[in-house]
């Protein structure tokens, strides 16, 4: 499947959730014991590891309701809603999540070092290369959204990076 060219439509909203809803999401994230059954590898060359755990229904419902209301969109399907813990890596793991089932996604930063180096980088393609164009720092309860064909990566390669927990969601919109 050919990935369509991407224009950036990245939106950032600090204090996205109410204190009550963020506490629920944060409490669930803090109780997760990420282990070897939760590993996700990006590719065979680098084997950068993401630890993931599916979010419970209460968290899915909070995310769907708030994203739908904030962006004034109708969500047909929530394809992915999972906690992700990213560890430090030596290389950038640039990727996009485009598929027929996913056209919009969000990351809600939950727990980590609140600085730019624990956030997410957004890239443009120049030939066979991806060039960092925009980076967004980590801040708890910050929601970042973009279309699924945008190239992105955690900024986990910098010296200042510390492990972070985020809530990743991917949607099919009406």
Regions from the language model: what does each represent?
Residues 1-82, 89-91:
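Non-heme Fe(II)/2-oxoglutarate
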Residues 80, 84-174:
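Catalytic core of non-heme Fe(II) oxygenases with the double-stranded beta-helix
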């Amino acid at each position: 499947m050919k990935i369509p060219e991407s224009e950036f439509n990245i939106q950032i909203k600090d204090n996205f959730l109410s204190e009550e809803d963020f506490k629920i999401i944060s409490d669930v994230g803090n109780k997760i014991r990420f282990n070897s059954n939760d590993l996700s590898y990006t590719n065979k060359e680098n084997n950068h590891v993401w630890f993931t755990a599916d979010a419970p229904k209460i968290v899915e419902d909070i995310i769907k309701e708030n994203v739908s209301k904030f962006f004034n969109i109708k969500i047909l399907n929530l394809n992915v809603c999972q906690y992700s813990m990213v560890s430090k890596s030596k290389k950038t793991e640039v990727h996009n999540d485009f598929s027929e089932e996913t056209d919009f996604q969000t990351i809600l930063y939950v727990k980590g070092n609140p600085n730019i180096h624990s956030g997410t980088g957004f890239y443009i393609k120049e030939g066979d290369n991806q060039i960092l164009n925009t980076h967004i720092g980590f801040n708890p309860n910050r929601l970042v959204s973009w279309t699924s064909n945008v190239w992105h990566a955690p900024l986990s390669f910098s010296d200042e990076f510390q492990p972070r927990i985020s809530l990743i969601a991917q949607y099919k919109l009406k």
